[in-house]
């Protein structure tokens, strides 16, 4: 398994802002407007509720300090209570409404992924990188908590923190500016450290994919009935179990290294949190003892100073979390944009005509599978004339299936050309070309249907 190579440490193809623009585009094209309207409203309401909670107690204390009438005190308490109840109800309602837009965007991306897999060029199905990206794209959108949907949650939390940060900054504008700068500086350092450490998983994603793929293969062999006879006859049970356990130990070691790296991000953040909160508390206590700060203002500034640090930390922490999610979504986008070696919609149209005879010719065709040391087919010339019946006979591995795949356009030759009525098939729309053939290969899968429907591949 490769570790420490350039391959495992490649940078993401798309950054946070490019992924954000991409996700907004997916939502816009799918007309999922609620991710914009409801998401923004939810952020405003959530921040507003926190601000109202901050102002509640200082407002009551201020009324008591100034010796106002009981009616004024009850009015303040009643007004804030009604406001908080309304904001809480609105927050719960918007949270529920926001679920549908996020899920619809995720379903759209899952649909795009499924269409990519179903309609991709056949050589991509032999490409290890394509298969790895496909598996990662599935994991990134398989549940509501994965990156494709959690992306919107993170952006909502960032907007909430930005609104709260602006409001608290206004409240603290009368305090020492150096205190605010200290809070911001320590939070920025924490964010940068967390961002660098949280990229560890992305930099080693190829290594993780190798472990996951091997585990999936061993599980398939151990549970698939078609391998049961060989496992029992040759006594392979202990070997399969040992292979599973050894791979699981390697994967466990990988996870331990990953979580150890992530732990350092939390340690750094905790140390900086102690520094910035300690400085804020010390300054407020000095104002109270030396300048006689009123109790209501002390409580307001005390809560605002604590909250200000939390808003700043929240902004940067959520950006770090969003950055990590965007790494996963970058993988999804790389999969969806994986290059196609064949031409489809951009190829020349090829009309199927029942009154037109078709001749297939292989002209000096060679084919070598990726990673192979020699050609499976070498310098082959073959002509299949209209109406001609041919039988291809050969040993296992001689290239019979490969030859048929070349004729059917599932593979392009490494050298030479495949000609249809004298024309190279590569410029054509490959899907139009496929409509000319009906190939039955030795691979099969039995559907949960009648024998007739399995043979006909349709309902009769």
Please report, for each region that a protein language model flagged, where it lies by residue.
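Short intracellular "coupling" helices and adjacent cytoplasmic loop segments at the cytosolic face
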Residues: 2-11, 113-143, 208-242, 334-347, ...
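An intracellular "coupling" helix at the cytosolic face of ABC transporter transmembrane type-1 domains
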Residues: 29, 138-151, 203-210, 220-223, ...
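Cytosolic ends of transmembrane helices, especially the final helix of ABC transmembrane type-1 domains
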Residues: 236, 280, 299-337
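Membrane-integrated ABC transporters
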Residues: 1-48, 70-75, 130-166, 214-216, ...
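Transmembrane helix-loop-helix hairpins at lipid-water interfaces of multipass membrane proteins
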Residues: 36-93, 169-201, 275-282, 286-296, ...
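ABC-type nucleotide-binding domain
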Residues: 345-460
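Juxtamembrane helix-loop junctions of ABC transporter transmembrane domains
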Residues: 53, 57, 84-126, 130, ...
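Conserved catalytic Walker-motif region of ABC-type ATPase nucleotide-binding domains
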Residues: 117, 244, 362-364
């Amino acid at each position: 398994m490769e570790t420490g190579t350039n391959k495992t440490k490649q940078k993401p193809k798309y950054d946070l802002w490019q992924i954000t623009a991409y996700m907004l585009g997916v939502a816009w094209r799918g007309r999922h407007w609620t991710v914009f309207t409801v998401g923004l409203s939810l952020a405003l309401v959530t921040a507003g509720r926190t601000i109202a909670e901050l102002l509640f107690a200082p407002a009551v204390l201020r009324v008591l300090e100034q010796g106002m009438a009981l009616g004024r005190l009850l009015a303040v308490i009643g007004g804030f209570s009604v406001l908080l109840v309304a904001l809480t109800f609105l927050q719960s309602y918007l949270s529920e409404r926001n679920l549908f837009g996020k899920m619809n965007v995720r379903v759209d991306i899952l649909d795009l992924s499924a269409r990519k897999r179903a309609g991709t060029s056949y050589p991509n199905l032999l490409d290890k990188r394509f298969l790895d990206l496909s598996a990662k794209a599935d994991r990134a959108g398989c549940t509501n908590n994965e990156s494709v949907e959690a992306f919107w949650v993170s952006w909502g939390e960032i907007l909430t923190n930005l609104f709260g940060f602006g409001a608290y900054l206004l409240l603290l504008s009368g305090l020492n500016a150096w205190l605010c700068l200290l809070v911001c500086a320590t939070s920025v350092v924490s964010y940068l450290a967390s961002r660098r450490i949280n990229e560890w998983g992305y930099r080693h994603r190829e290594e993780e994919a190798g472990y996951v793929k091997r585990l999936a293969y061993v599980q398939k062999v151990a549970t698939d009935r078609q391998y049961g006879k060989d496992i029992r006859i040759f006594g392979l049970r202990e070997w399969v179990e040992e292979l599973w356990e050894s791979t699981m130990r390697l994967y466990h070691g990988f996870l331990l290294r990953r979580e150890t790296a992530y732990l350092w991000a939390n340690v750094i953040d905790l140390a900086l949190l102690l520094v910035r909160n300690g400085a804020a508390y010390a300054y407020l206590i000095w104002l109270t003892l030396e300048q006689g700060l009123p109790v209501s203002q002390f409580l307001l500034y005390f809560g605002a100073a604590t909250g200000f640090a939390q808003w700043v930390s929240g902004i940067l922490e959520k950006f770090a979390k969003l950055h990590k999610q965007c790494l996963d979504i970058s993988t999804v986008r790389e999969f969806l944009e994986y290059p196609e070696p064949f031409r489809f919609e951009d190829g020349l149209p090829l009309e199927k005509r029942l009154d037109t005879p078709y001749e297939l010719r292989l002209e000096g065709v060679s084919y070598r599978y990726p990673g192979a040391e020699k050609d499976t087919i070498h310098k082959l010339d073959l002509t299949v004339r209209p109406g001609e019946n041919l039988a291809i006979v050969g040993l296992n591995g001689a290239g019979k299936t490969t030859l048929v795949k070349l004729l059917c356009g599932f593979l392009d030759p490494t050298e030479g050309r495949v000609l249809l009525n004298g024309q190279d098939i590569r410029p054509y729309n490959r899907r139009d070309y496929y409509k000319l053939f009906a190939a039955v290969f030795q691979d099969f899968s039995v559907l949960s249907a009648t024998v007739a429907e399995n043979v006909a591949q349709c309902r009769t």
